[in-house]
Amino acid sequence: MTWIVSKLSRVIWRRKGGCFRLVERVIQGFAAQSAIRGATEGREELEARYLPYFDERLRLRQLVTYVPNKVAPIHRWFPYKEGFSYQLVEMLLREFGTDPAHHRIFDPFAGCGTTPLVARQMGFGAWGIDILPVAVFVAQVKLRGLEAYNLAHLRSEIDRLLNMPFHPSSLSAPQDVRIVQLAYEPETLEQILFFKEEIRRIDNKAIREFLLLGLTSILEDVSYTSKDGQYLRLRRDKKIPAVRDVLHSQLEMMYSDLASKQVQLSLPGLVETSSGGHSDGRCYVAQADARSFVDSFDDYADVIITSPPYLNRYDYSRIYSLELCLQFVNEFEELKRVRHSLLRSHIESRESPTDDVHHPALLEILDNLAGQDLNNPRIPVMIKGYFEDMNLVLRQLARVCRPGARVALVVANARFHGELIPVDLLLSDLAVDAGFEVECIIVTRYKGNSSQQMGRFGRVAVRESIVVWRKASAAHLS
């Protein structure tokens, strides 16, 4: 394979077979690194150095989204738009040549459990962690196999709950979380609290949490809100259906998924390892911080398939505030504690307690943004905090990975005030420092910019990629 860079036009061509193919988009365009005439040398060096590692596979564009999970049994139990598809996990496990008898799968940003659930369905032992309480709850319920339920008892409890006459509940929602009060009609909120109280009376934990997940999953549907990018938007024109009707549909769908023969066959119990194998067949998701988890777990990883929060200002404590307030927080101060515990990809990030990342390209970006009229002055704090946090994560992953382990990380680049941030390449450099080797960077799609940025700085598509690393063998580790 031959690469040619035209110094006059900065157009990049790749020779494959007997012809050249334009791959200008892959390298993000040198001139686009800064729209405010700031320094770009650090990012140009990164792009040029990693150019041979790019593998453009735009056919995967939908697999890095949650869209396919919306119709997949069990995966569809909770709407989690920030995840990737079950098909991506299947594809990567096949491409990596993994063996259930010898390899253990891990996801440090497990979200609603797509990676461990697919791994379990394919016969692997797997585990995951996440810091967002509602995500951990959803993942734990989805990971329960059929053996956790008496289907006749579950069917009976579903019917009993849905046919129970309404009565006022003794429970209340957080009074100082404004979005909860704005999101619901009083009658709707009363219905939600009624069903929550009745579900809490059920002794069987698996059934109780199954029903509670059903209720949690419909909170947006029966509200005046809509998850819209980084916000939970109010939509007063939205027609609100009856809570009982929506809950009925949700629980029937979940029950049919659990009871179907196809799903039964794809949810094995513990993995049976072949003779001489050493796989750990446990499958679980726990609440933990990816920046500091290793010492709390006696576990390991041969393959990591994950996606950290993107550097896109999304605040998961806002996006999922209704779900958090249903069962995980009782007041606004508790919601704030959740917010400030998250990886710093959002605008309310606090100043970094560490100062370990001094990458030239990152310093270049921060220097260019200094003194600019930003639409939010905390953007540089967020950018700095994001890479400080991810540096901590990568060092934790290096400790949990066995030598030769593969890591697939789905990430997206960002652009703030016309400054392009090559997240995939910056993280790859940090990963190398942590003890990994870069294998390839699979470009899956190109994302647009906000209308505000396009109006001021023009349109520049940014990469969404799967960066693939390998843990260096023991002989290469310092």
Specify the residue positions occupied by each region the protein language model found.
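Core SAM-dependent methyltransferase catalytic element
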Residues: 402, 456-478
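S-adenosyl-L-methionine
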Residues: 3-4, 8-99
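Conserved proline-anchored active-site loop of SAM-dependent methyltransferases
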Residues: 105-122, 126-133, 139, 211, ...
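SAM-dependent methyltransferase catalytic-core segment centered on the flexible catalytic loop
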Residues: 311-396
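Conserved beta-strand signature within the Rossmann-like core of class I S-adenosyl-L-methionine
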Residues: 334-336, 405-411
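SAM-dependent nucleic-acid methyltransferase catalytic core
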Residues: 189-306, 311-318
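Conserved helix-to-beta-strand junction in the class I
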Residues: 393-403, 434
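Conserved phosphoryl-transfer catalytic core
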Residues: 134-198, 322-351
